[in-house]
């Protein structure tokens, strides 16, 4: 039997996307939580990337026709956790957007695909990305998800990235079973757990501050993504700057 923590008294504190944002810059995370009025409108290129991501996500789900999706409102974390547990209790072995919350730090996560290992109480985590190779921030992303799920009662066997297979040749309709491939990054994910715990605590602590953190601008404003608070932080930088 799976003993998943459902009746959580800890309030949700930080999500996976917020964790990844905080890794890039603590100030960006603080602004995201406290000054969303400063966010840049997403560019057409960003919107296109999101659309492609949604398409790849749908293809990934098509690989698992018996899967069931958690469809609670995005802000209803406790509702999503309870729905996930109900689907498991009902005997579902594949759950899309399965949700868990760390009982101590309040970190929470929605995994793209939670898949039971056949005839066991073990589970695999599968994170889907519209990329052809594993990037460092993908490892951080999945390491955070492992951190949340493994500490909330799930026995995790393996952690996978599901990526685009660039050797796939399309003939007719896209075959979802061939255009995507699984890459096992379980060891890298496990090796990051102490780091994830430390950084999560640091980020949660920084979010309690009343003023924005002091951060220097520079290369990190562009890697792994161009920050959507760049116009705010760079407002005093002249056009001829080396940046």
Go through the PLM ranges and name each one.
Residues 140-148:
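Short amphipathic alpha-helical face segments that pack within enzyme cores
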Residues 48, 52, 101, 105, ...:
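Conserved aromatic-histidine-acidic binding/catalytic patches
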Residues 133-136, 148-230, 236:
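Metal-dependent nuclease catalytic regions and adjoining charged, substrate-binding loops involved
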Residues 93, 112, 122-124, 157-160:
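Beta-sheet entry/capping signal
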Residues 107-140:
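Non-catalytic protein-protein interaction segments used by genome-maintenance enzymes to assemble
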Residues 98-102, 115-117, 129-132, 163, ...:
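Short, flexible loop/turn elements at secondary-structure junctions
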Residues 1-119, 239-243:
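Metal-dependent nuclease catalytic cores that hydrolyze phosphodiester bonds in DNA/RNA
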């Amino acid at each position: 039997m799976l003993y998943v923590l459902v009746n959580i008294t800890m309030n949700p504190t930080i999500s996976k996307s917020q964790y990844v944002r905080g890794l890039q810059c603590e100030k960006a995370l603080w602004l995201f939580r406290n000054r969303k009025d400063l966010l840049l409108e997403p560019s057409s290129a960003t919107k296109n990337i999101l659309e492609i991501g949604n398409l790849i996500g749908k293809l990934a789900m098509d690989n698992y026709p018996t899967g069931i999706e958690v469809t609670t409102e995005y802000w209803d974390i406790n509702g999503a956790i309870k729905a996930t547990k109900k689907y498991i209790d009902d005997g579902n072995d594949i759950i899309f957007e399965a949700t868990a919350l760390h009982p101590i730090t309040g970190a929470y996560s929605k995994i793209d695909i939670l898949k039971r290992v056949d005839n066991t109480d073990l589970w695999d985590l599968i994170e889907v990305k519209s990329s052809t190779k594993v990037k460092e921030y993908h490892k951080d992303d999945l390491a955070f998800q492992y951190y949340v799920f493994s500490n909330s009662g799930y026995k995790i066997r393996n952690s996978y990235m599901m990526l685009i297979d660039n050797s796939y040749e399309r003939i007719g309709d896209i075959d979802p079973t061939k255009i995507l491939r699984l890459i096992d990054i379980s060891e890298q994910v496990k090796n990051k757990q102490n780091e994830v715990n430390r950084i999560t605590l640091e980020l949660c602590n920084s979010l309690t501050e009343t003023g924005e953190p002091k951060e220097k601008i520079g290369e990190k404003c562009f890697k792994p993504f161009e920050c959507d608070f760049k116009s705010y932080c760079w407002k005093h930088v002249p056009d001829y700057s080396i940046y």
